[in-house]
Amino acid sequence: MKIRNAQSKDSFSISKICKNDLIQLTNKDEIFKNYEIYKSCMYMPTEEKFCNLIEKYLNEKSIKIFCCKDENKTNGMIVVSFIEDNKIEVFGIAVDTLHQHKGIGSFMINNLIEKFNLKYILAETDNDAVGFYRKNNFAITQFEKIYNNTKVIRFKCELIK
């Protein structure tokens, strides 16, 4: 089987997978079920860390958690903070491994842009995901950051509409 990146002609298939919209998640038990998906965008993930992070997010009014579903199965999740009107910061974006490289991550970003009339999106990522942001026309700036006394390369990703 050959896997290719999604193209604009695939948008109908992608919208079928995601039911044409993102669903905001507010129930922590429902969110907790998605650990296996979301852990791919966490640093040294554990279920306990995930649950604590979600609890923190749910207590912050500016942070929203959205998912993309097919039937009752979550295919992707995105966590964003609304900085101010028309501006968000992406805290995490993840797609189920069975559905990666089908355009679902791009669909989630584009759906948020349309739904909230976004003019600016900020994200920070590592080398594993910078290609996703580059493919979605984000401007990329590389910088160094210290994690656990270790210098790591990070990327600031910005999309200005």
Regions found by a protein language model. Name each.
Residues 63, 150-156:
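Short hydrophobic/aromatic beta-strand or adjacent loop that forms the aromatic wall/cage
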Residues 67, 73-82, 87-94:
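Conserved beta-strand in the GNAT
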Residues 114-127:
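Conserved GNAT acetyl-CoA-binding A-motif
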Residues 95, 101-114:
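Conserved acetyl-CoA-binding loop-helix of GNAT-fold acetyltransferases
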Residues 127-150:
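Conserved active-site alpha-helix within GNAT-family acetyltransferase domains
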